[in-house]
Amino acid sequence: MSSLQTSFPWGFKKAVISKPTKNKRKIQEDIDTLGDAKSRTKFHPNNSNSTSRKHRTHAIMGTKLPLNTLIETLDHESLQKLVKSLVEQRPDVQEALYNAAPTVTVQVCIDKLTDKVENIKCNLPYKVDTECDYTYLRVKALVHEFFQALSDYMLNFLPPQEYDVSKSIEFLNGFLLKVLLKMPMFSHMEFKYYYKLTLDKLNTVYVNLIADFIQQKPTNILLLKDSDLAEKLLEINKHYEDYFEQVSQLLSQDEGSDIPERLQGLSNLLNFSSENNPLNGGVVSSVKGSW
Protein backbone atom coordinates (compact mmCIF):
# COMPACT_ATOMS: atom_id res chain seq x y z
CA MET A 1 0.00 0.00 0.00
CA SER A 2 1.28 3.39 -0.90
CA SER A 3 0.83 6.18 1.53
CA LEU A 4 -1.16 9.29 0.33
CA GLN A 5 -0.25 12.80 1.33
CA THR A 6 -2.72 14.56 3.55
CA SER A 7 -2.62 17.67 1.38
CA PHE A 8 -1.60 18.78 -2.08
CA PRO A 9 1.54 20.76 -2.53
CA TRP A 10 -0.44 23.75 -3.98
CA GLY A 11 -2.47 24.09 -0.77
CA PHE A 12 -5.90 22.81 -1.98
CA LYS A 13 -7.92 20.58 0.31
CA LYS A 14 -9.10 17.23 -0.87
CA ALA A 15 -12.68 18.05 -0.03
CA VAL A 16 -12.73 20.61 -2.77
CA ILE A 17 -12.39 18.03 -5.54
CA SER A 18 -14.13 15.12 -3.87
CA LYS A 19 -16.98 13.29 -5.60
CA PRO A 20 -19.81 14.91 -3.63
CA THR A 21 -18.87 18.19 -5.32
CA LYS A 22 -20.01 16.80 -8.65
CA ASN A 23 -23.45 15.97 -7.33
CA LYS A 24 -23.83 19.37 -5.69
CA ARG A 25 -23.12 21.09 -9.01
CA LYS A 26 -25.79 19.05 -10.78
CA ILE A 27 -28.35 19.82 -8.10
CA GLN A 28 -27.52 23.51 -8.31
CA GLU A 29 -27.96 23.46 -12.11
CA ASP A 30 -31.37 21.85 -11.70
CA ILE A 31 -32.39 24.51 -9.23
CA ASP A 32 -31.23 27.27 -11.58
CA THR A 33 -33.13 25.72 -14.48
CA LEU A 34 -36.29 25.50 -12.43
CA GLY A 35 -35.89 29.10 -11.30
CA ASP A 36 -35.51 30.31 -14.89
CA ALA A 37 -38.66 28.45 -15.90
CA LYS A 38 -40.65 30.05 -13.10
CA SER A 39 -39.25 33.45 -14.00
CA ARG A 40 -40.30 33.11 -17.62
CA THR A 41 -43.73 31.96 -16.55
CA LYS A 42 -44.14 34.95 -14.24
CA PHE A 43 -42.96 37.77 -16.52
CA HIS A 44 -43.81 36.42 -19.96
CA PRO A 45 -47.42 35.31 -20.10
CA ASN A 46 -48.67 33.32 -23.05
CA ASN A 47 -49.88 34.97 -26.24
CA SER A 48 -53.58 34.78 -25.40
CA ASN A 49 -53.21 36.83 -22.21
CA SER A 50 -50.93 39.35 -23.96
CA THR A 51 -53.46 39.88 -26.75
CA SER A 52 -56.23 40.36 -24.23
CA ARG A 53 -54.26 43.06 -22.42
CA LYS A 54 -53.51 44.92 -25.67
CA HIS A 55 -57.22 45.20 -26.38
CA ARG A 56 -57.73 46.87 -23.02
CA THR A 57 -55.11 49.61 -23.73
CA HIS A 58 -56.55 53.10 -24.51
CA ALA A 59 -55.82 54.16 -28.14
CA ILE A 60 -54.29 57.63 -28.93
CA MET A 61 -56.66 59.26 -31.39
CA GLY A 62 -55.73 62.05 -33.84
CA THR A 63 -57.49 65.43 -33.73
CA LYS A 64 -57.67 68.59 -35.86
CA LEU A 65 -55.19 71.37 -35.23
CA PRO A 66 -56.46 73.97 -32.75
CA LEU A 67 -57.60 77.07 -34.62
CA ASN A 68 -54.83 79.23 -33.12
CA THR A 69 -52.18 76.76 -34.26
CA LEU A 70 -53.76 76.45 -37.70
CA ILE A 71 -53.76 80.23 -38.22
CA GLU A 72 -50.16 80.46 -36.99
CA THR A 73 -49.12 77.74 -39.45
CA LEU A 74 -50.68 79.31 -42.56
CA ASP A 75 -48.56 81.63 -44.66
CA HIS A 76 -49.82 85.03 -45.85
CA GLU A 77 -51.25 83.76 -49.14
CA SER A 78 -53.02 80.78 -47.56
CA LEU A 79 -54.49 82.94 -44.81
CA GLN A 80 -55.69 85.45 -47.39
CA LYS A 81 -57.42 82.71 -49.37
CA LEU A 82 -58.99 81.37 -46.19
CA VAL A 83 -60.50 84.74 -45.25
CA LYS A 84 -61.78 85.34 -48.80
CA SER A 85 -63.35 81.89 -48.90
CA LEU A 86 -64.98 82.46 -45.51
CA VAL A 87 -66.46 85.79 -46.65
CA GLU A 88 -67.79 84.22 -49.85
CA GLN A 89 -69.44 81.38 -47.96
CA ARG A 90 -70.64 83.54 -45.07
CA PRO A 91 -71.37 87.12 -46.23
CA ASP A 92 -72.81 87.85 -42.79
CA VAL A 93 -69.32 87.81 -41.24
CA GLN A 94 -68.12 90.82 -43.25
CA GLU A 95 -69.26 93.35 -40.68
CA ALA A 96 -67.60 91.37 -37.90
CA LEU A 97 -64.34 91.33 -39.86
CA TYR A 98 -64.49 95.09 -40.40
CA ASN A 99 -65.07 95.67 -36.70
CA ALA A 100 -62.27 93.33 -35.63
CA ALA A 101 -59.70 94.42 -38.22
CA PRO A 102 -56.95 96.83 -37.10
CA THR A 103 -56.85 100.33 -38.57
CA VAL A 104 -55.02 100.47 -41.89
CA THR A 105 -52.29 103.11 -41.79
CA VAL A 106 -51.17 105.35 -44.64
CA GLN A 107 -47.66 103.90 -44.61
CA VAL A 108 -48.94 100.33 -44.92
CA CYS A 109 -50.99 101.31 -47.99
CA ILE A 110 -48.04 103.11 -49.58
CA ASP A 111 -45.84 100.06 -48.94
CA LYS A 112 -48.40 97.71 -50.51
CA LEU A 113 -48.71 99.86 -53.63
CA THR A 114 -44.92 100.06 -53.87
CA ASP A 115 -44.74 96.26 -53.69
CA LYS A 116 -47.23 96.01 -56.55
CA VAL A 117 -45.12 98.33 -58.71
CA GLU A 118 -42.01 96.27 -57.96
CA ASN A 119 -43.94 93.12 -58.86
CA ILE A 120 -44.83 94.67 -62.23
CA LYS A 121 -41.16 95.44 -62.85
CA CYS A 122 -40.08 91.93 -61.91
CA ASN A 123 -42.49 90.44 -64.46
CA LEU A 124 -41.42 92.60 -67.40
CA PRO A 125 -40.04 90.56 -70.31
CA TYR A 126 -36.26 90.49 -70.45
CA LYS A 127 -34.62 93.03 -72.78
CA VAL A 128 -37.91 94.24 -74.26
CA ASP A 129 -38.58 97.99 -74.39
CA THR A 130 -41.59 99.38 -72.50
CA GLU A 131 -42.57 101.12 -75.74
CA CYS A 132 -43.53 97.73 -77.12
CA ASP A 133 -47.19 96.75 -76.66
CA TYR A 134 -46.12 93.18 -75.94
CA THR A 135 -44.40 94.39 -72.77
CA TYR A 136 -47.59 95.92 -71.39
CA LEU A 137 -49.73 92.94 -72.33
CA ARG A 138 -47.40 90.68 -70.35
CA VAL A 139 -48.12 92.62 -67.14
CA LYS A 140 -51.59 93.95 -67.94
CA ALA A 141 -53.30 91.96 -65.18
CA LEU A 142 -50.80 93.26 -62.61
CA VAL A 143 -51.34 96.85 -63.79
CA HIS A 144 -55.11 96.45 -63.40
CA GLU A 145 -54.55 95.05 -59.91
CA PHE A 146 -52.38 98.06 -59.05
CA PHE A 147 -54.94 100.66 -60.15
CA GLN A 148 -57.75 98.79 -58.42
CA ALA A 149 -55.77 98.79 -55.16
CA LEU A 150 -55.09 102.52 -55.58
CA SER A 151 -58.81 103.18 -55.95
CA ASP A 152 -59.62 101.15 -52.84
CA TYR A 153 -56.97 102.82 -50.70
CA MET A 154 -57.83 106.34 -51.88
CA LEU A 155 -61.52 105.88 -51.04
CA ASN A 156 -60.50 104.62 -47.61
CA PHE A 157 -58.85 107.97 -46.85
CA LEU A 158 -61.73 110.20 -47.99
CA PRO A 159 -64.85 111.42 -46.13
CA PRO A 160 -67.07 110.02 -44.80
CA GLN A 161 -64.69 107.13 -44.17
CA GLU A 162 -61.84 109.41 -43.04
CA TYR A 163 -62.34 113.01 -41.87
CA ASP A 164 -58.73 113.68 -40.89
CA VAL A 165 -57.53 115.73 -43.86
CA SER A 166 -53.90 115.29 -42.83
CA LYS A 167 -54.13 111.54 -43.48
CA SER A 168 -55.75 112.13 -46.87
CA ILE A 169 -52.99 114.55 -47.86
CA GLU A 170 -50.32 112.21 -46.50
CA PHE A 171 -51.61 109.42 -48.72
CA LEU A 172 -51.79 111.65 -51.81
CA ASN A 173 -48.26 112.97 -51.33
CA GLY A 174 -46.87 109.54 -50.55
CA PHE A 175 -48.43 107.98 -53.63
CA LEU A 176 -47.37 110.76 -56.02
CA LEU A 177 -43.79 111.02 -54.75
CA LYS A 178 -42.97 107.46 -53.68
CA VAL A 179 -45.10 105.13 -55.81
CA LEU A 180 -46.32 106.45 -59.14
CA LEU A 181 -42.89 107.80 -60.11
CA LYS A 182 -41.56 104.22 -60.00
CA MET A 183 -44.18 102.88 -62.40
CA PRO A 184 -42.83 102.02 -65.89
CA MET A 185 -44.26 104.40 -68.49
CA PHE A 186 -45.84 102.03 -71.00
CA SER A 187 -46.79 103.34 -74.43
CA HIS A 188 -49.90 101.17 -74.73
CA MET A 189 -53.11 103.19 -75.16
CA GLU A 190 -54.87 101.50 -72.25
CA PHE A 191 -52.08 102.33 -69.82
CA LYS A 192 -51.99 105.95 -70.97
CA TYR A 193 -55.71 106.13 -70.29
CA TYR A 194 -55.30 104.78 -66.76
CA TYR A 195 -52.34 107.04 -66.05
CA LYS A 196 -54.13 110.18 -67.25
CA LEU A 197 -57.27 109.22 -65.34
CA THR A 198 -55.19 108.76 -62.21
CA LEU A 199 -53.73 112.26 -62.38
CA ASP A 200 -57.14 113.79 -63.15
CA LYS A 201 -58.77 112.13 -60.18
CA LEU A 202 -55.97 112.83 -57.73
CA ASN A 203 -55.97 116.49 -58.74
CA THR A 204 -59.74 116.65 -58.19
CA VAL A 205 -59.46 114.96 -54.81
CA TYR A 206 -56.60 117.21 -53.73
CA VAL A 207 -58.38 120.46 -54.70
CA ASN A 208 -61.62 119.40 -53.02
CA LEU A 209 -59.85 118.35 -49.81
CA ILE A 210 -58.05 121.67 -49.47
CA ALA A 211 -61.14 123.72 -50.42
CA ASP A 212 -63.34 121.88 -47.91
CA PHE A 213 -60.75 122.20 -45.16
CA ILE A 214 -60.43 125.96 -45.63
CA GLN A 215 -64.20 126.47 -45.89
CA GLN A 216 -64.70 124.68 -42.57
CA LYS A 217 -62.62 127.36 -40.86
CA PRO A 218 -60.90 130.22 -42.73
CA THR A 219 -57.93 130.17 -40.37
CA ASN A 220 -57.19 126.60 -41.47
CA ILE A 221 -55.28 128.06 -44.40
CA LEU A 222 -52.70 129.27 -41.89
CA LEU A 223 -52.26 125.71 -40.65
CA LEU A 224 -51.63 124.54 -44.20
CA LYS A 225 -49.13 127.31 -44.84
CA ASP A 226 -47.26 126.50 -41.64
CA SER A 227 -46.90 122.87 -42.73
CA ASP A 228 -44.52 121.56 -45.39
CA LEU A 229 -47.41 121.13 -47.85
CA ALA A 230 -46.25 123.97 -50.09
CA GLU A 231 -42.81 122.35 -50.47
CA LYS A 232 -44.40 118.97 -51.19
CA LEU A 233 -46.64 120.47 -53.87
CA LEU A 234 -43.67 122.25 -55.42
CA GLU A 235 -41.90 118.91 -55.74
CA ILE A 236 -45.04 117.17 -57.05
CA ASN A 237 -45.62 119.81 -59.74
CA LYS A 238 -42.00 119.50 -60.78
CA HIS A 239 -42.41 115.77 -61.45
CA TYR A 240 -45.87 116.01 -63.01
CA GLU A 241 -45.48 119.14 -65.14
CA ASP A 242 -47.57 121.45 -62.95
CA TYR A 243 -50.54 119.09 -63.05
CA PHE A 244 -51.41 120.07 -59.46
CA GLU A 245 -50.86 123.79 -59.86
CA GLN A 246 -54.45 124.53 -58.83
CA VAL A 247 -53.76 123.03 -55.41
CA SER A 248 -50.75 125.29 -55.00
CA GLN A 249 -52.87 128.29 -55.94
CA LEU A 250 -55.30 127.47 -53.13
CA LEU A 251 -52.47 127.61 -50.62
CA SER A 252 -51.40 131.02 -51.91
CA GLN A 253 -54.80 132.51 -51.00
CA ASP A 254 -54.91 134.96 -48.11
CA GLU A 255 -57.02 134.30 -45.04
CA GLY A 256 -60.65 135.20 -45.77
CA SER A 257 -60.27 135.03 -49.56
CA ASP A 258 -63.01 133.47 -51.63
CA ILE A 259 -62.33 129.78 -52.14
CA PRO A 260 -63.43 128.27 -55.47
CA GLU A 261 -66.14 125.65 -55.42
CA ARG A 262 -65.34 121.97 -55.46
CA LEU A 263 -64.38 120.50 -58.80
CA GLN A 264 -67.31 118.54 -60.24
CA GLY A 265 -66.16 117.83 -63.76
CA LEU A 266 -64.76 114.41 -62.90
CA SER A 267 -67.28 113.29 -60.31
CA ASN A 268 -68.79 110.72 -62.67
CA LEU A 269 -65.51 109.03 -63.58
CA LEU A 270 -65.13 105.41 -62.67
CA ASN A 271 -62.77 103.96 -60.17
CA PHE A 272 -59.86 101.95 -61.55
CA SER A 273 -61.68 98.66 -61.83
CA SER A 274 -60.70 96.77 -64.97
CA GLU A 275 -64.28 95.48 -65.23
CA ASN A 276 -65.47 99.09 -65.65
CA ASN A 277 -62.77 100.09 -68.10
CA PRO A 278 -64.43 102.04 -70.98
CA LEU A 279 -61.81 100.61 -73.32
CA ASN A 280 -63.31 97.18 -72.63
CA GLY A 281 -66.86 98.34 -73.29
CA GLY A 282 -67.75 99.36 -69.74
CA VAL A 283 -70.49 101.91 -69.11
CA VAL A 284 -69.56 105.15 -67.37
CA SER A 285 -71.43 105.61 -64.10
CA SER A 286 -71.10 107.38 -60.76
CA VAL A 287 -68.83 106.09 -58.06
CA LYS A 288 -69.23 106.10 -54.32
CA GLY A 289 -67.63 108.76 -52.15
CA SER A 290 -65.73 111.67 -53.66
CA TRP A 291 -63.49 109.47 -55.79
From Swiss-Prot:
Localization: Cytoplasm; Nucleus
UniProt GO MF annotations: proteasome binding
GO cellular component annotations of the record: cytoplasm; nuclear membrane
Record's keyword annotation contains Ribosomal protein: no
Listed GO biological process terms: nuclear protein quality control by the ubiquitin-proteasome system; proteasome localization; protein transport
InterPro entries per UniProt: Cut8/Sts1_fam, Cut8/Sts1_sf
Recorded superkingdom: Eukaryota
Assigned keywords, A-Z: Cytoplasm, Nucleus, Protein transport, Transport
Region (Disordered): 37-56
A Pfam family that the UniProt record links to this protein: Cut8
Transport as UniProt keyword: yes
Subunit structure, as described in the record: Binds the proteasome.
UniProt function note: Involved in ubiquitin-mediated protein degradation. Regulatory factor in the ubiquitin/proteasome pathway that controls the turnover of proteasome substrates. Targets proteasomes to the nucleus and facilitates the degradation of nuclear proteins.
Family: Belongs to the cut8/STS1 family.
Protein name, as recorded: Tethering factor for nuclear proteasome STS1
Gene encoding the protein: STS1
